[in-house]
């Protein structure tokens, strides 16, 4: 299968970054350590910029007096060398700002590093002993298939691909992949933000294409009961211990519901046990990111939409982050159109209530409007949607509907939260407009 993209990247395994060769094809990404002769021959120049009077943030060992090359023995977290992100333990330092250190003593190397100035260009090279260790690193990459081989192939179907958050990746060079089960993840670091953009776009495009096949397989397994109309990984904004964060979720849309899972369900029984269910008829999209808004990294570059659902516990809000504007458009359209079609399929809902102290039943019908039945089934009143002037609720049990003169405002005690009826009423009104072909 033809490669979509190939190149050197760093992967985070066992607490350290390791350089590997990554090759992407339409269904999988393959990771392998570089051939020893290639890796040993690869010399690279890393620019480190010191700040606020701090040093490079490395310790070295070796030198002519020890019959060793000058080797990085420690990289101090948070300091300049660590922030550069391209230096590794046991890298051999060949030169500092053009000054050759291949034959330097330890003391000469220390002096060269100290007088290097604020901007330091280090030419470095992987060490032979380090490469012997690196050859097996991809065998330690964990994924759902639990296959450990010298060349690691990771399937992309139903994998989650996302950009790392601003807190973890100020330079925009890190991508994150999560396995379908949600148990394993892999961080991949590129040489620049532009390189990361290219890798992300290629990976995301592959996973998106594979969703079509996965969706068909899911519906075959479920026997279209329910029929899954749309599905995929998203990140939901949650609060844990007072801290707001984005948590990966697997979200699906059926003919009537939005289902949230912690990961991709593997068995039919798992599909029947979502973490959370929201009815489409009582859900609406209330806010989306704008393509034209100015982009401020870490603030307005998050692509998201917000849904609100009327429930017996009141209004529940879900803020959903996706990775591309195309993905945003697909999700928003799926939720909005799915809501209309769910209303068309449902066509009528009813709820027990009190009206003027009497037990009644409120009927909301897509074609006939709103009606109220007595406990004996007598129609107490009935009004079309067109006669509604205004609606309101107290955030609790009470709903007000103003039909204008001569009938005026009617107050209903819905015994539980009025929000489901309020949301469904508005969904029915929007569906009538959609049915007229006025939805763009």
Swiss-Prot record:
Note whether Membrane occurs among the keywords. yes
- Identify the Gene3D superfamilies for this entry: 2.30.42.10, Pleckstrin-homology domain (PH domain)/Phosphotyrosine-binding domain (PTB)
Question: What does the record list as GO biological process?
Answer: acetylcholine transport; muscle cell cellular homeostasis; negative regulation of locomotion; neuromuscular junction development; positive regulation of locomotion; regulation of backward locomotion; regulation of egg-laying behavior; regulation of forward locomotion
User: Keyword Membrane on this protein?
Assistant: yes
Among SUPFAM superfamilies, the record links this protein to: PDZ domain-like, PH domain-like
Question: Which UniProt keyword terms apply here?
Answer: Cytoplasm, Cytoskeleton, Membrane, Repeat
Output the SMART domains linked to this UniProt entry.
PDZ, PH
Which terms in the GO cellular component ontology are assigned?
cytoplasm; cytoskeleton; dystrophin-associated glycoprotein complex
One of the entry's Gene Ontology molecular-function terms is: calcium channel regulator activity
Q: What quaternary structure, including any partners, is listed in this protein's UniProt entry? A: Component of the dystrophin glycoprotein complex (DGC). Interacts with dyb-1, dys-1 and snf-6 to form the DGC.
What is the protein's name according to its record? Syntrophin-1
Traced from the root, the source organism's taxonomic lineage reads:
Eukaryota, Metazoa, Ecdysozoa, Nematoda, Chromadorea
């Amino acid at each position: 299968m033809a490669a979509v993209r190939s190149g050197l990247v760093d992967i985070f395994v066992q607490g350290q970054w390791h350089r590997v060769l990554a090759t992407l094809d339409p269904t999988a990404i393959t990771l392998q350590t570089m051939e020893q002769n290639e890796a040993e021959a690869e010399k690279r120049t890393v620019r480190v910029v010191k700040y606020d009077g701090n040093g490079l943030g490395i310790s070295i060992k070796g030198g002519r007096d020890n019959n060793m090359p000058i080797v990085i023995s420690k990289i101090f977290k948070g300091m300049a060398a660590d922030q550069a992100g391209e230096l590794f333990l046991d890298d051999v330092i060949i030169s500092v700002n053009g000054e050759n250190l291949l034959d330097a003593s330890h003391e000469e190397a220390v002096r060269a590093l100290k007088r290097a100035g604020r901007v330091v260009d280090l030419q470095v090279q992987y060490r032979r002993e380090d490469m012997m260790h690196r050859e097996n690193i991809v065998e330690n990459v964990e994924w759902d298939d639990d296959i450990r081989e010298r060349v690691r192939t990771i399937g992309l179907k139903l994998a989650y691909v996302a950009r790392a958050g601003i807190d973890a990746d100020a330079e925009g060079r890190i991508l994150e992949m999560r396995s379908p089960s949600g148990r394993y993840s892999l961080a991949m670091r590129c040489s620049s933000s532009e390189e990361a953009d290219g890798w992300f776009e290629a990976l995301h495009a592959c996973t998106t294409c594979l969703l079509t096949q996965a969706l068909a397989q899911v519906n075959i397994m479920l026997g279209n009961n329910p029929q899954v109309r749309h599905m995929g990984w998203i990140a939901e904004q949650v609060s844990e211990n007072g801290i707001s964060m984005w948590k990966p979720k697997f979200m699906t849309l059926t003919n009537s519901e939005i289902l949230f899972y912690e990961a991709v369900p593997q068995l039919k029984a798992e599909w029947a046990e979502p973490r959370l269910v929201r009815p489409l008829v009582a859900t609406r999209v209330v806010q989306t990111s704008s393509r034209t808004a100015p982009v401020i990294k870490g603030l307005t570059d998050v692509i998201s939409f917000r849904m609100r659902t009327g429930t017996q516990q009141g209004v529940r809000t879900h803020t959903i982050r996706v990775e591309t504007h195309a993905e945003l458009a697909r999700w928003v359209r799926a939720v909005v159109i799915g809501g209309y079609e769910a209303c068309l399929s449902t066509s009528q809902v009813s709820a027990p209530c009190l009206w003027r102290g009497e037990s009644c039943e409120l009927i909301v019908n897509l074609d006939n409007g709103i009606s109220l039945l007595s406990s004996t089934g007598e129609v107490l009143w009935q009004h079309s949607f067109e006669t509604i002037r205004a609606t309101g609720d107290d955030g609790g049990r009470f709903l007000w509907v103003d039909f204008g003169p001569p009938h005026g405002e009617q107050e209903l005690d819905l015994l539980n939260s009025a929000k489901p009826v309020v949301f469904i009423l508005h969904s029915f009104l929007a569906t009538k407009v959609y049915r007229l072909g006025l939805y763009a």
